[in-house]
Amino acid sequence: SRGLGDVYKRQLIEQYAAYLEKKNWSRATLGIVMRNTRTIINRAIKKRKVSYNVHPFVDYSIPQSPVRDVSIRLESLSKILNAEVDSNYLSVARDLFSLSFYLGGINMTDLMDMDFRNSRYIQYSRKKIMGRTSNANVIILPVHEKAACIIAKWMNPRTGKLDFHYNFTYKNFSRHISRGIAKLAKELGIKERVVYYSARKTFAQLASELGIPDGVIDYCLGHSDKSRGVIRYYAKVKEKQAEIAINRVIDYVDHPEKYKEFLEMRADIMLMKS
């Protein structure tokens, strides 16, 4: 019967996962493979190539990667954003890191694919989310003046995209920049581990410290919207809130002394609530 067939398919998924686990892959790699498998099944269902009474993944939980704690202290972040460098290599590394931070923690793949010819705002859907769902959110974020200066420095006016005059594949370019960021951090005397992703994690951390709501931080980061029922007006509100959030986080980095009293008061309130 179809019921027994569905049970068998669910067992097959679990057996497949057990087979992959024997390869001693990391949880991150196993999670990627199983998510891709689920995506293939979902697309087949959507195209009516297969049908199930019960989804094969209903009893299987995809392993989650451990959260990478690569956020850095405000002082370290400020050193990188304001670093004076004497090589093109470190200049590119610093500017890409800075752009990620100034644009709400944007991922490198989305940043490199962005058309910046509209100088006031960027609009995109995260590639990482687009690969998992057909309902990917469109994110609209302001281009802060600090980001605009960097964009003007590197943008190809014909394509609107950043052009660093490297003839690398994206994968090799990403590795090249990662090494550059690590080298820059070392030269600046930063002891923490610093990677491109640190800009994203640190933006989220500072925004949280300032009391910016999680929903607004998620919007800036481009996290998928699980509600799926967001009306147009609400989306417009999120855009404005995101603009305020980004401006406030950048102002906090530039003028931390302005926020000292607020942060101390907020810490006291959080302590009383705990």
Question: Which role does the model predict for each range below?
Answer:
Residues G3-Y8:
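Short, small-residue-biased leader/transition segments that mark boundaries at the very start
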Residues R27, G31, Y52-M108, M112:
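Basic, Lys/Arg- and aromatic-enriched nucleic-acid-binding interface segment
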Residues S71, R126-R132, L221-H255, M270:
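Catalytic-site neighborhood detector that most strongly recognizes the C-terminal catalytic loop/helix
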Residues D86-S87, S178-Y219, H223:
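Short, basic (Lys/Arg/His-rich) helix/loop patches that form interaction surfaces
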Residues M112-I150:
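Conserved tyrosine-mediated DNA breakage-rejoining catalytic core shared by Y-recombinases
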Residues F116-I122, K191-E192, I212-A235, P256-A267:
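Short, polar N-cap/turn motifs at the start of nucleic acid-interacting alpha helices
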Residues H144-K191:
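Active-site/catalytic core of tyrosine-dependent DNA strand-transfer enzymes
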Residues E145, R158-T159, N167, R228, ...:
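C-terminal secondary-structure termini that scaffold catalytic or DNA-interacting sites
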